[in-house]
């Protein structure tokens, strides 16, 4: 997908929602060009508490539900099931006197691709889709969904080498080591180019190590919490797991929130909180990370480098990060608060990266930072220090483009524009590097704008005033800019207050057409993530 198309999707507030799918079909949020579920097939019911096996009279109806999801989806079907009830699942059986491991219609399996499986409340155990060196190929989407008013629970969900699944409204929860499993709570992966995965939709998932971690000590956190909430990770730098979408889900009480490491991936509308390392780790091509809320990270004593979103080593292209909020601490009762870098990539090599409309409130040196970025746009973000945790050298979160990472080449063709931050820096010795129409928000009367002259950093720009390319160091700090900014009570309303210097001070070139709320940027463009509107 081109960068322009990605931004257009963000501007519209939708992500390839099907406009007319036909009778019975619904629109799901997926990355542009990925498959959508078609018309719905039959609906089946499972109940792990009151259901029965087929042998005992269960027929999958609402009045006689089956009792095992494993019996429907897995080659390891339990007693009372003579084969997987879903026809696309390979399994061992005898055909024409020979033992084979294939998917077929032998025995008239009732569940077909295109059908929906409704789950009643109860514990379904560890759910595994796919097998070693085998692939489950669905020509149409199979939907596994919580029935209305029900809370089905999986211990883990492991999806590999398969196609076309929707999981919706499922709670996935277990402690680290449950059933000897150290896997992420939810995994989507492949087994190489010959056994890929594609078109996996996860919607409205509730993913956590436990409901309540209050009272856990830091060692107990490290011993009990799952290492990763949701992991979508393809081999060959994301190429063999594609078209994964994770939307409107809640990931909580884990060490790492999510891994966005599959090509053509959408990660949108999710909340990640109470985590002990990074909120989102990402490295892939054609990914859209939008409208997520990441907050309340915790220090657990394991030496973690804390990041809201961190880019990983590898070559990535066509990355859009738009309209996210990264708030270091929103809960006054958070047990182990700590610093949190915002949105960054210290490693890897990045081509066509757009970072727009994001809000970062933190105690850290880096609010938004990239290096080895080529064709980058960091536009209309708001990055401010909460001032609650002193940092080495009294650094404050800024918007920064550096020269290069450990693995990548020097940055080129990058724009820093229309941002509000407590510091601004660009390695302008690289070709086609632009920094204009930004506002440097003072703390105690100072804010540093760092550029390079003759190969050396120019440190002397920190006093209020207007500098080159309409970059402004303002005088009044956060109190003069935002509707409400009160770190003492963890209240951060970063809309622009009437009369704020940022109103109308932006550059319309390359600015996103809507702000973080979806409001249009019509006429004069404001600086920061929010376009000003009269308060109601």
Predicted features along the sequence, with ranges:
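Extracellular beta-strand/beta-solenoid scaffold signature
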Residues: 129-132, 153-157, 179-193, 215-241, ...
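Surface beta-loop-beta hairpin patches that serve as ligand-binding interfaces in beta-rich domains
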Residues: 28-37, 68, 83-112, 456-458, ...
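Extracellular beta-strand-rich solenoid/capping regions of secreted or surface-exposed proteins
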Residues: 99-118, 124-143, 149-200, 222-239, ...
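Predominantly extracellular beta-rich ligand-binding scaffolds that present long acidic/polar faces
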Residues: 127-128, 323, 347-493
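Extracellular beta-strand scaffolds
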Residues: 124-125, 150-155, 173-174, 178-179, ...
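Right-handed parallel beta-helix/beta-solenoid
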Residues: 27-99, 123, 481-484, 488
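The right-handed parallel beta-helix/beta-solenoid scaffold, focusing on the short coil/turn
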Residues: 42, 115, 125, 140-142, ...
């Amino acid at each position: 997908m081109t960068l322009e198309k990605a931004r257009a999707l963000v501007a519209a507030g939708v992500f390839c929602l099907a406009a007319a799918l036909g009778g019975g079909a619904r629109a799901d949020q997926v990355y542009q060009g990925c498959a959508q579920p078609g018309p719905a097939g039959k609906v089946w019911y499972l109940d792990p508490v009151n259901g029965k096996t087929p042998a005992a009279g269960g027929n999958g109806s609402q009045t006689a539900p089956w009792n095992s999801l494993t019996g429907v989806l897995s080659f390891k079907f339990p007693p009372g099931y003579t084969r997987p009830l879903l026809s696309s699942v390979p399994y061992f059986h005898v055909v024409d006197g020979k033992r084979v491991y294939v998917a077929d219609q032998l025995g008239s399996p009732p569940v077909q691709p295109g059908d929906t499986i409704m789950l009643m409340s109860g514990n379904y155990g560890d759910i595994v889709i796919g097998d070693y060196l085998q692939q489950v190929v669905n020509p149409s989407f199979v939907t596994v969904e919580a029935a209305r008013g029900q809370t089905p629970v999986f211990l883990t969900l492991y999806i590999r080498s398969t196609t076309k699944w929707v999981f919706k409204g499922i709670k996935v929860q277990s402690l680290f080591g449950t059933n000897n499993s150290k896997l992420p709570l939810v995994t989507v992966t492949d087994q190489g180019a010959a056994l890929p995965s594609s078109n996996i939709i996860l919607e409205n998932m509730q993913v956590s190590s436990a409901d309540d971690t209050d009272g856990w000590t830091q060692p107990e956190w490290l011993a009990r919490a799952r290492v990763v909430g949701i992991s979508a990770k393809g081999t060959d730098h994301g190429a063999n797991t594609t078209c994964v979408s994770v939307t409107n889900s809640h990931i909580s009480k884990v060490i790492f929130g999510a891994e966005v490491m599959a090509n053509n991936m959408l990660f949108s509308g999710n909340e990640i909180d109470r985590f002990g390392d990074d909120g989102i780790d990402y490295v892939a091509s054609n990914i859209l990370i939008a409208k997520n809320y990441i907050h309340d990270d915790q220090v657990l004593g394991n030496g973690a480098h804390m990041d809201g979103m961190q880019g990983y080593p590898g070559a990535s292209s066509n990355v859009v990060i738009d309209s996210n909020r990264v708030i270091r601490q929103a809960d006054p009762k958070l047990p182990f608060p700590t610093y949190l870098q915002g949105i960054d990539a210290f490693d890897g090599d990045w081509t066509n990266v757009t970072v727009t409309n994001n809000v970062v409130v933190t105690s850290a040196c880096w609010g938004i930072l990239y290096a080895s970025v080529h064709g980058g746009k960091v536009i209309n973000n708001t990055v401010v220090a909460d001032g609650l945790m002193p940092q080495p050298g009294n650094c404050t979160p800024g918007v920064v483009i550096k020269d290069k990472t450990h693995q990548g080449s020097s940055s080129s063709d990058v724009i820093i524009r229309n941002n509000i931050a407590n510091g601004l820096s660009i390695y302008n010795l690289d070709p086609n590097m632009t920094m204009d129409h930004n506002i440097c928000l003072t703390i105690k009367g100072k804010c540093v704008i760092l550029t390079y002259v003759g190969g050396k950093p120019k440190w002397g720009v920190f006093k209020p005033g207007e500098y080159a390319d309409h970059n402004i160091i303002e005088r009044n700090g956060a109190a003069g800019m935002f509707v409400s900014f009160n770190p003492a009570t963890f209240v951060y309303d970063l809309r622009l207050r009437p009369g704020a210097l940022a109103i109308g001070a932006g550059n319309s070139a390359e600015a996103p057409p809507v702000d973080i709320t979806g409001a249009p940027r019509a006429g004069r463009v404001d600086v920061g993530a929010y376009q000003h509107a009269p308060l109601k």
